[in-house]
Amino acid sequence: MESLFGLQTTTSPYKFLYPFETLCARFSSDRTGSCRACTQTDSKQLGSKSTLILSKTQYDPLTITMKTPTKTRTHNDYTVGWVCALPKEQTAAKAMLDQIHPTLSKPPNDQNSYTLGSINKHNIVIACLPKGKYGNNSAATVATRMVSTFPFIKVGLMVGIGGGIPPKVRLGDVVISTPTDQYPGVVQWDIGKAEKGTNFKRTGALNNPPSALLTALTILETNHEMHGSKTREYMDDLGKKWPKLVPEYTNSDSLKDPLFIQDNSPHALSSWVAISSIFWKMVLSLLGYLLGWSTLAPMHSGAEQATKITAKVKIDGAQKKPGDIRVHYGLIASGNQVIKDAKFRDSLNASLDGNVLCVEMEAAGLMNDFPCIVIRGICDYADSEKNKDWQKYAAAVAAACAKELLEHLQPSDVDGERPVKDVLSDG
């Protein structure tokens, strides 16, 4: 028997860890010792020398504990940096977090806005570029401030939207930057020397991502081949947690892909007939010009249309259904110029040996200041039909894929990496 605040209590097989009156607010105040929650106690009227006997009817042994206070997180607890360029990309990123953490203070010279949270066992810092300030230089500034304020960030992600290179890549697909041949996963196409026309020769190289991320990427690619992507599962989870986002961020049924032919009508014009029609229009236009009947229409517009329809024919062979999400691994071309021309896009791809899967505007600025993996949801084809219809859905798909990658990133591997701030200080 042990004395506990004047009460005689049995010691075995039961254990009290805290004073009786602080254990459970559910004990009645009539000093009978009965618990309103379980009513499984046999007790006598309590007094200064009474005995409290707890029965073994429900618990054996009975251990009552107090909740351990949650540890207060500091800047040093965050090891993953996640950078996005657009508010819609930040919305998708925040919606993918398992938990959202309270904000922390930041230095006066840090103008970034941060969202803190966690996925799996990783504490994550999300930062978005200032509204209206896009491109490589702005991305580099945001990343530099982030690793200064959160000095133990060791791995980075650049997650958002980009333009796909057909016919390999389709709207709603995901492209993950992966080292390819002599390229480190991301190439800054507008750093180099011009040779002929729009062709150029790339000069210099960008940093590779941390080894921990590349290891996780290998596991992710293997799992995708064997079991398929879990991206759709994470998209569905987002819809359950944030139902207001469903119409634009998780549902692609109402979105149209200009390179996807899904016309079951018996009167539908075949792709080859369409190509033939464009060809004869170009011939007649040239003939009319030579005879002085009309001015010559821009030839590249017809060529772009023919390229699109040819891509349609190739894409049809893949039989991808609307809503399917495919993940591609390969080269991303990054530059400070928006690409909205199919001819230039294809020339750029050809100059990089046909390895380009995606074009975008921020990643190259990060690679030397914030070595990371770039994940892009495809929202357009970087041609004259570029629009914003697919952007929110593509942002959510990219964020879901980033979450899946983090599920395969081992905390022990992250611990083994040096902080990005230290790596950069070494020059």
Regions found by a protein language model. Give the residues of each.
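Cysteine-centered motifs
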Residues: 24, 35-38
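Intrinsic-disorder/coil detector with helix-boundary
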Residues: 35, 60-427
